[in-house]
Structure formats: C-alpha cells, structure tokens
Amino acid sequence: MGKNKYTLAVLGAGTLWGFMGFFRRTLDTMGLSASNCIAVRGLFAALLFGVAMLITDRKAFRVKLRDAWCFFGSGIVSLLLFSLCYFKAMDYMSLSNAAILLYTAPCFVILFSALLFKEKITARKLAAMVIAFAGCCLVSGIGTGSKISTTGILFGLGSGICYALFSIFSRFAINRGYSTFTINFYTCLLAGFGAMAVGGAEFIPVITSTAPNLLFAAATGLVTCFLPYLLYTYGLTGLENGKASIMASIEPVVATLCGIFIYNEALTVMSAVGILLVLSAIVLLNLKSKTA
C-alpha cells in the first residue's frame, strides 16, 4: 500500500475526531465541565495505551529524562492547552468563529515544520491548505455568528497554535525513536492529570455512578482520543507534518455529517460546498507528483 496506509491512518484519525461533538454533548448532559471532558478523554485513553504497552512491549514505558520535554509539550502545551483555549474561545465568540480559528492549525504546522524540520513548502501544499481552510470556514458557517472580541481571537489563535504543536512535539519524539504508543501514553496521561489539576476530580463519582455512564466515558476515551491519536501519530511516521495536518481537516466534515444524521441538523448549501472543498484538498494532496 506504500504511503496509502499512512494517508488512511490520518483520515481515520480525523474521522474519529469528528465524533467529538456527539460525545461532548452527552458528557455535558451528565454535568461534566470542559476540563472534566478533557480529563475523561485523556485518562481513559492513557489507560488503554498503558494496557496495550503492558501486553506488547513493557520497554515502551521507558523515557529518557532529556526527552521528557517532548511529552510535556504534546500533553500539556498541545492537548491540554489547545482544548482549554478552544473552549474558552467559545465563551467570547460564536462556535463557528472559534472553529475557524482552530482550523488555522495547518498553517502553523506547515510554517513550524519548514523552520524546524526543513519540510518543503510546495505550491500544491499551499493550495491544498488554502482550499481546506476555505472548506472548513464554510462548513463551520462563517459569518453566521456576530459575537467576537479581541480576547476571543487570541484564545482562538492559541487553540490553533497549540493544536498544531502536537504534530511538532510528536515529530521530535518520533525522530528520537519513541513509538506511537509511548508518545500517546504520556501525552494523554499528562493531559488528563493536567485537566484534573485545572477542573478538579468531581467527575469521577458521576462517571462511576452507573455502568452506562462508565461505559460511555470509556467509549469517549477510545473513540475520540485513543484510536485517533494512535492513527495520527502512526500517519506521521510516513507523512510530512503539513500534509497530515491538512488531511486531518476531514474532522469538521465528519462533525457536520454527525449533526445531520444524529441530530437532524440541516445541510446548508454553504456546508455542502465546504465539504467538497475539504475533500478536494485531500485529493489534491494525494495526486502523484515529483514535487508534491
């Protein structure tokens, strides 16, 4: 399959992330805060990664002290801060505007990767980035929300930058020989405990009060954190950061489709065009070319 397997892995990750809205809404009904949701995702995913490592390779738990910053970066600076900034941005602007600023992430990934890893900024990559961003804007409903502020913009851009940094810190860890399991175990563990430090642990009695609640919390960690981050970091082992980040833009497309099929939300012309643009960007990136 060549690089196709890495492409499919990243697309799979973006698809699973697209279901986050469904899980977040359900956790909201249980009374969990934004930081509680992050803790649930991170800790259950860390548990799954830990079990997998115990079964397959216990040596994967070993991390050199001089490399600890990679995992602090991916867990605290990226996963935790990206989520907190994104949720905070929603307090100062519409959901659509917050989402649009989050989707600036591929721009930062391409820039940082060019500076740090000497990845080439090709015309095709730039074109795909612009097309994907335009598609994300349309899918998110640009212009439908008027509430906006400087504080909201700063939090929104912060979410985009922190989101982008996961690819960067993960690349540093991959280049140092760490497996996708090691990277994600410590990323999720640190993000989970970091979220508990911010929002407390009052969610624990809630999710353990009934078997359905506990199963749903575990499913949240599995579907929105364990599987997508495993797939995405695996994709990074065979793809450039910039390409992977752009292809992960399939996430808002899936989120929109979830809204349509699960919550009976209407598919607008704007959203339909946005979906086509995102898919076009993904196709453009995967056309064979010596310069792509």
What do the PLM-derived regions correspond to, one by one?
Residues L48, M53, Y86, A105-V130, ...:
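C-terminal transmembrane-helix exit sites in multi-pass transporters
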Residues T29-L81, F108-V109, C162-F169, N184-F203, ...:
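Transmembrane alpha-helices of multi-pass small-molecule transport proteins
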Residues V40, S83, A98-T104, S170-G192, ...:
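Helix-helix packing/entry segments at the starts of transmembrane helices
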Residues A45-K64, F133-K147, L190-N213, L257-F261, ...:
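Membrane-interface helix-cap regions at the ends of transmembrane helices
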Residues F49, F112, I121-G141, G160, ...:
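Hydrophobic transmembrane alpha-helices of multi-pass small-molecule transport proteins
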Residues G21, G50-N97, L138, G221-L239:
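Specific transmembrane alpha-helical segments of multi-pass solute transporters/efflux pumps
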Residues M1-N36, V40, G145-F172, F193-G194:
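Glycine-/small-residue-enriched transmembrane alpha-helix faces in small-molecule transporters
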Residues L27, C37, R41, A89, ...:
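Hydrophobic/aromatic residues within transmembrane alpha-helices
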